[in-house]
């Protein structure tokens, strides 16, 4: 087991400026190799408390999966359907706006997360109409469209991704989710998503968004065909861009769910990676991102509420969102994907922390009363 106490002491002593001379790839590899999850978790939790104390945030959220039509055919995805498949769907603009308005009325959502497949039949006018329709009807932040979806729109329009981003921002786009990153190493992408945008394209589109004043989250999907070197490389690429653009406001590591996917059918991945890998990834992420990205989500959607509670004790500060209508993870049969505000607040309090409702930019809205 690699002794990582010198790395942890550097971080605890604030012995560097992470935007200029922070932890390195070699440091990240040593942390990834270490089996001392408890010690790394203790340090990660202390770093989280330095930033946010005993508060844990969440957001009232609706997920809108607007289409499952996709021509990328990722081997890790159980959600997509090819064009003209009998189970393929695209939600109309009117229906999508109706769902958002209803969720605002019933649950007082602060954000709608809009994601779907790479549908070649949808031009930018669909998204502009959707965003403007939502903004006209209710005060809800639009957190929408991963870089790979942005790239798909640009290809349909024969336009640049920067122009697509600018038009979507004008239509009401507030921030971008970090989906489509998976592992930012093309060797891995060639195995799990050969038709999806390359790693450098994902990073470029994120940088373009940041330069246009559109903040985003970043993600890592681990526990499939990658190794720890790939994980470290992927995390370092996010760190490198953050030092440059300062546009990532949250990081979300989540484990691959193999059920009903091509990776499982081909025997490449049989099981999910388990709870200890989650806690290690959370702890390493907090340590590596300290001073760079303040917010790390506990990713209850793929790991369950109990593991999300443990993640809060290993460096996460955000429980993610209430979810109504999520269909991507649901397609794997992993678990129930509805979680209410009361359930989240209860889960946070059970580990002795204070629940705080936030907006899509991680600004605190209110401390939840006892």
Q: Which positions does each model-derived feature cover?
A:
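Glycine-rich, proline-tolerant flexible connector loops at the mouths of alpha/beta enzymes
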Residues: 32, 62, 84-85, 113-124, ...
């Amino acid at each position: 087991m690699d002794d990582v106490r010198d790395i942890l002491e550097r971080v605890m002593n604030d012995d560097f400026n992470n935007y200029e001379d922070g932890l390195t790839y070699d440091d990240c590899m040593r942390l990834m190799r270490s089996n001392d999850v408890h010690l790394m978790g203790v340090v990660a939790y202390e770093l989280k408390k330095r930033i946010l104390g005993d508060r844990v945030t969440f957001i009232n959220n609706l997920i809108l999966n607007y289409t499952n039509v996709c021509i990328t055919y990722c081997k890790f995805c159980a959600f997509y359907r090819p064009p003209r498949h009998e189970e393929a769907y695209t939600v109309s603009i009117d229906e999508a706006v109706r769902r958002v308005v209803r969720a605002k009325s019933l649950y007082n959502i602060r954000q709608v997360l809009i994601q779907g497949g790479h549908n070649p039949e949808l031009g930018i006018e669909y998204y502009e109409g959707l965003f403007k329709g939502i903004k006209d009807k209710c005060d809800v932040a639009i957190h929408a469209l991963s870089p790979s979806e942005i790239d798909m729109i640009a290809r349909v329009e024969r336009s640049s991704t920067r122009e697509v981003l600018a038009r979507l921002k004008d239509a009401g786009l507030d921030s971008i989710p970090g989906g489509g990153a998976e592992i930012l190493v093309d060797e891995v992408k060639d195995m799990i998503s050969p038709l999806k945008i390359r790693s450098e394209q994902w990073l470029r589109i994120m940088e373009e968004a940041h330069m246009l004043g559109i903040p985003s989250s970043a993600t890592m999907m681990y526990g499939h065909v990658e190794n720890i070197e790939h994980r470290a490389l992927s995390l370092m690429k996010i760190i490198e861009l953050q030092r440059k653009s300062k546009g990532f406001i949250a990081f979300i590591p989540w484990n691959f769910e193999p059920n009903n996917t091509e990776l499982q059918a081909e025997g490449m991945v049989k099981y999910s990676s388990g709870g200890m890998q989650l806690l290690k990834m959370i702890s390493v992420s907090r340590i590596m991102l300290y001073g760079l990205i303040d917010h790390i989500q506990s990713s209850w959607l793929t790991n369950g509420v109990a593991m999300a509670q443990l993640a809060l004790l290993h460096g996460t500060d955000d429980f993610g969102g209430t979810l109504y209508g999520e269909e991507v993870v649901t397609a794997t049969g992993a678990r129930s994907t509805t979680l209410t505000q009361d359930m989240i607040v209860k889960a946070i309090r059970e580990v002795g922390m204070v629940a705080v409702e936030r907006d899509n930019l991680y600004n605190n809205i209110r401390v939840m009363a006892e």
